[in-house]
Curated annotation (Swiss-Prot):
Coiled coil is among the record's keywords: no
Source taxonomy: Bacteria, Bacillati, Bacillota, Bacilli, Lactobacillales
Organism: Streptococcus pyogenes serotype M1
Top-level lineage group: Bacteria
Protein name as annotated: Phosphoribosylamine--glycine ligase
Family as reported in the entry's similarity comment: Belongs to the GARS family.
Length: 421
């Protein structure tokens, strides 16, 4: 069986590597992928994610069994619909189902309609009305661009002035273009955040281990929001009762609701949750695997990944098993200056040996193909599975201390919340 993974980051590296390790999978292509993936025997295809017709032609010419779609923008652009129309299978939601991610207002409407716990909110396209709402509600308050904004479209404002400025940047200054033409303004929720993922097909779903991401750039959750600087799974201090509540009050009603709306959901559903004094509430939905959470969840899968996905797509009950003990922890290494301006072309350390996994993201080979160089904001991620969060930290940070990370940076406290609890 030959498979195609669409995307180019660390998430797609983890997906493709796990698929290639599955029985019956002979070859995994990644479009466009990154040069670091070739070190794990993956084949790159020089087609960008927005070129649906070229991807479809490639899949047909190479007798691809099915495609796994990684990035949110491809799903929002209807790549799954296009593959299906061409008679090809793709694992991911249709454009209509993916609206759970590409419109925060739509997600809110679904949650309200199906009684899913989330923050109180208002949606605005008129700046003066947004400003009046902010002034009426007070701070802290959260301002979100309605559409996709590379994970940067959320401002947690500690003052009314900050919130008004964020709304102005989105609605009047076109900071995020069409994605910010509407804003969702939410009450601030206090509590610890965690991620819950599920494989889904219609109202059938299969929960994955819990994970905790670290969005801020710097230690102590300081600095600007990023795509994510590290993660670990499962979250050891999170009671199973909280997970069970989230499944029954959030995951199940949302997926059943999407079926009722005529938008049945196939793919990975990510639920960003916050554990408040009133129980778990939804911060956001993503219509695909998270990055970096994928890189610490998939190493815990002990069943056959390709078979699991194939079964889910076919409506067959999958046999999914997860490692029960230990913790998987990963730290992202990023270009200095990320998430703002950064240099490219920094030489990278050689791939680690042993049981530390390296997943590559923003990298490319030098002209003579002897060296990997940085080529993006988030560059690579080191992942290990150990008995505890502390053991995972020790292993990764010892390895990083031995690497030359000049021109790069990473957080030194990934997983520390689990140790403090």
């Amino acid at each position: 069986m030959k498979l195609l993974v669409v995307g180019s980051g660390g998430r797609e590296h983890a997906i493709a590597k796990k698929l290639l390790a599955s029985k019956g999978v002979d070859q995994v292509f990644v479009a466009p992928g990154n040069d670091g993936m070739t070190l794990d025997g993956l084949d790159l295809v020089n087609i960008v994610v927005s070129e649906h017709s070229r991807l479809i032609a490639f899949a047909k010419e190479n007798e691809i069994s099915w495609a796994f779609i990684g990035p949110d923008d491809a799903l929002a652009a209807g790549i799954v619909d296009d593959f299906n129309s061409a008679g090809l299978r793709a694992f991911g939601p249709t454009k209509a189902a993916a609206e759970l991610e590409w419109s925060k207002d739509f997600a809110k409407e679904i949650m309200v309609k199906y009684n899913v716990p989330t923050a109180a909110y208002g949606t605005f396209s008129d700046f003066e009305k947004a400003k009046a709402y902010i002034e009426e509600q007070g701070a802290p308050i959260v301002v979100k661009a309605d559409g996709l904004a590379l994970g940067k479209g959320v401002v947690v404002a500690e003052t009314v002035e900050q919130a008004v400025e964020a709304a102005q940047e989105m609605l009047l200054d076109n900071k995020f273009g069409d994605s910010g033409a509407r804003v969702v303004i939410e009450e601030f929720l206090d509590g610890e955040e965690f991620s819950l993922f599920a494989f889904a097909n219609g109202d059938k779903f299969y929960i994955m281990p819990t994970a905790q991401d670290h969005k801020r750039a710097f230690d102590g959750d300081k600095g600007p929001n990023t795509g994510g600087m590290g993660a670990y799974a499962p979250v050891p201090h999170l009671p199973q009762s909280v997970v069970d509540t989230a499944v029954e009050m959030i995951v199940r009603p949302v997926l059943e609701g999407m079926v009722a709306e005529g938008r049945p959901y196939l793919g990975v559903l990510y639920v960003g949750l916050i554990l408040t004094a009133d129980g778990p509430k939804v911060i956001e939905f993503n219509s695909r695997f998270g990055d970096p959470e994928t890189q610490i969840i998939l190493p815990r899968l002990t069943s056959d990944f390709a078979q699991n996905i194939d079964d889910i797509m076919m409506g067959i009950e999958p046999y999914i098993t997860w490692q029960k003990d230990g913790v998987t922890l990963g730290v992202v290494v990023a270009s200095e200056g990320y998430p703002f301006d950064y240099e490219k072309g920094v030489p990278l350390p050689e791939k680690t040996d042993g049981d530390i996994i390296t997943y590559y993201a923003g990298v490319k080979f030098s002209e003579n193909s002897e060296l990997l160089l940085s080529n993006g904001g988030r560059v690579y991620m080191l992942v290990t599975t150990e008995d505890s969060v502390k053991a995972g930290q020790d292993k990764i940070y010892t390895q990083l201390a031995q690497q030359d990370t000049t021109g790069l940076f990473y957080r030194n406290d990934i997983g520390s919340k689990a140790i403090r609890e």
